[in-house]
A protein has these predicted regions:
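Structured, non-membrane catalytic/scaffold regions adjacent to prosthetic-group chemistry
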Residues: 43, 47, 52, 95-96, ...
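Hydrophobic multi-pass inner-membrane translocation pores used for secretion
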Residues: 178, 182, 212-226, 501
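Actinobacteria-biased recognition of intrinsically disordered, low-complexity terminal regions
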Residues: 1-24, 163-192, 552
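N-terminal secretory signal peptides and thylakoid transit peptides that target proteins
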Residues: 188-209
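Helical transmembrane-bundle signal
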Residues: 38-42, 98, 123, 213, ...
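Hydrophobic alpha-helical membrane-embedded or membrane-associated segments
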Residues: 26-37, 94, 119, 141-149, ...
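Membrane-embedded alpha-helical segments of integral membrane proteins
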Residues: 82-179
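Membrane-anchoring hydrophobic segments
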Residues: 1-110
């Protein structure tokens, strides 16, 4: 038998104390309604595509709209987990919003319905107008909003059950037309004389939670059919016509120095900085690279067209993100496989008036690369292989651009589907629109890997070691300073290629005490790394990496 509780406050007159007592349950109802909405949205997104997910769409919009200092702070604070932090932050905001709507709906259900509908419209607009969006991508958010409204009304009903004193009024209302009863239901809220049906509320809550989990889980399962991991694993890469230079024996100092960065970065550890909340999935059979703009004529290439070329090259190249701070880890080296970019552009009749290549990703991202670098940098390439395997999906599968000597935001377009030969006057790419420098050659950089900052270690002889890079120029020397002493020359790993970073090591005898260690590099052309500090925005960081350590 269902029991209905009447708040003592109802007997004494004022409704506020009774309403305050139900606010936690109303907030929970709002949260559960949001869960149902998100679950339904994910279910429909599973039928359409990952880009249509309401959370992803809103997150993409946030990335587009937030100021650059906020993005820089997120990357510096969360590193490669910045997207996870964004999704978590989005969900927290949704949860707070939903809880407030639940409390408002306790007084007037229309407020909750309007609030959920508004959020659905915002999500639908974000999905439909996103770089890779379309009208169909609005459906998950709209379906989620509808499910959320139904869930909210169902959850609010047990919180405002008419008591015996109000039963006659409700009985009289039953004879009213349907439209009037619906309006009354939406506007009713916490009416005078209403009670609380706890059992019904908890049963409805359990059903809502189950629906949210079931639909959300089903949506995740459906999204797996878009995964291209299997197709990537089956892709056969061609042998290079021009292999990478052979590495001399003992080239990787990390094999004998603990804590030193390896010469090559494993794919799973290679840094990833981009704006894609969900990694784009392109099936090899569907891939097409379009050339437009200032070429002899427009043309498209399939992946087989690129893989079947006779001029495939293999090169060892270090990439660096412009967001890398002094001493940061947003740099990595891989053995890349692809076709020479300069020859490819000339073959397609690129015109002399073009000074910018507008590179387009499948997710709508645009990267502006200087045409001159693409043509003149010897090892610039369209890459489809990384460290002996097809490009990882996270790093641009099936094709990306690699131009040594330039920060990634003006060269390393991932999931590349279009190249437009254009000019800087005619088009501002994504980052240029946000006031980053239009052209940004990588600055000379060096880093201390070991000992770690603030590390305590036994006094005695110990290796100070790290890496340094100056792509296209090469590293000619690395020096280390202990406290305010003289600059001491470090030993360098063999120079394999000017585009590849060099490891360095300096054995040093430490007496007990605290020490400040500083490193600087000199390019093979004789340019000394600047001591002037600069933040990553707008053209890359500069300054010397310095740490404090303690010998005991």
């Amino acid at each position: 038998m269902t029991t209905t509780e009447q708040s003592p406050a109802a007997a004494t007159g004022p409704d506020a104390p009774r309403r305050r007592g139900r606010r936690p349950l109303a907030a929970a109802a709002g949260l559960l309604s949001a869960g149902v909405a998100l679950g339904a949205g994910e279910l429909v997104a599973g039928l359409i595509g990952p880009q249509s997910s309401p959370v992803v769409a809103v997150g993409d919009t946030v990335i587009t709209l937030v100021p650059e200092p906020v993005k820089a702070f997120a990357i510096a604070t969360f590193g490669e987990s910045d997207k996870i932090a964004l999704v978590v932050g989005t969900l927290v905001v949704i949860a707070l919003y939903a809880a407030v709507l639940g409390v408002l709906a306790l007084r007037r259900r229309t407020a909750g319905v309007v609030g959920i509908t508004l959020f659905g419209v915002v999500g639908a607009a974000a999905a439909a107008t996103g770089p890779a969006g379309g009208p169909l991508d609005a459906l998950p958010a709209l379906a989620g909003a509808l499910a959320g409204v139904v869930a909210l009304l169902a959850l609010m009903a047990p919180l405002t059950v008419p008591t015996a004193g109000a039963a006659q009024t409700r009985s009289d209302d039953d004879g009213a037309p349907l439209a009037e009863r619906l309006r009354a239901s939406l506007g009713a809220g916490d009416r005078k004389g209403a009670g609380l049906d706890r059992r019904r509320f908890f049963l409805t809550s359990a059903a809502a939670a189950g629906a949210a989990v079931a639909t959300g889980g089903a949506g995740r399962l459906l999204l797996r059919r878009f995964d291209v991991g299997g197709a990537r694993a089956d892709l056969a890469l061609p042998a290079p016509a021009s292999p990478a230079a052979a590495l001399p024996a003992g080239a990787d100092l990390a094999e004998r120095i603990d804590g030193l960065t390896p010469l090559f970065t494993p794919n799973r550890e290679f840094y990833r900085v981009d704006t894609a909340i969900t990694v784009p999935q392109i099936r090899p059979a569907d891939y097409e690279l379009s050339l437009t703009g200032m070429f002899g004529s427009p043309r498209s290439y399939t992946l087989d067209d690129l893989l079947g070329r006779s001029d495939v090259i293999e090169r060892d190249i270090t990439l660096t993100c412009v967001s890398n701070t002094v001493g940061g880890r947003l740099a990595g080296t891989a053995r890349w496989l692809g076709i020479p970019l300069g020859a490819f552009l000339r073959e397609n009749g690129i015109r002399s008036g073009s000074d910018q290549l507008v590179c387009r990703s499948v997710d709508g991202m645009t990267i502006g690369a200087p045409t001159r670098s693409a043509l003149e940098v010897e090892d610039a390439m369209l890459a489809f292989g990384m460290n002996g395997e097809p490009l990882p999906v996270e790093h641009g599968f099936p094709v990306r651009m690699v131009i040594p000597g330039l920060y990634g935001y003006v060269s390393a377009c991932k999931w590349l589907t279009g190249i437009e030969a254009s000019t800087y006057d005619a088009f501002d790419a994504y980052w240029t629109e946000r006031d980053w420098a239009a052209q940004a050659p990588i600055r000379i950089a060096s880093r201390i890997d070991t000992p770690a900052p603030l590390r305590r270690f036994p006094a005695g002889r110990r290796a100070i070691a790290g890496v340094a890079w100056a792509q296209t120029r090469g590293i000619g020397a690395v020096e280390v300073r202990v406290d305010d002493g003289p600059w001491l020359p470090a030993q360098l790993s063999p120079q394999v290629d000017a585009d590849l970073w060099r490891q360095w090591v300096l054995p040093h005898d430490f007496a007990p005490g605290s020490y400040q260690l500083t490193v600087r590099a000199t390019s093979a052309e004789g340019e000394v790394q600047t001591e002037e500090r600069a933040e990553p925005f707008p053209a890359g960081s500069s300054g010397l990496h310095s740490i404090r350590v303690n010998a005991t």
